[in-house]
């Protein structure tokens, strides 16, 4: 095809990419998380992209808490958090696991970092 390539206009730019299909990834956060800020971020994320986020679950290190908090949701529905009484085996950091369809995991990483201001955040398989 010899036709010139043009970039899509910003008005037509979407963060949905059907070529991505169903994928999963984890956010690993090596800093304590402010509970209110996290709740606001997750609410906004699921409000905007809940139809593309099939599942989110995780264990969080919350500022001021001695033990982790477990969270989970399905699309637009978030269940009540569970305050755990012990730490599971392994490293004591926050981890959120997402199952997505047609949504770039990099978008979730960028939004989390921008919204929370936390820098010790990475993705994992």
Mark where each language-model region is.
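Flexible loop/N-cap segments at domain edges
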Residues: 98
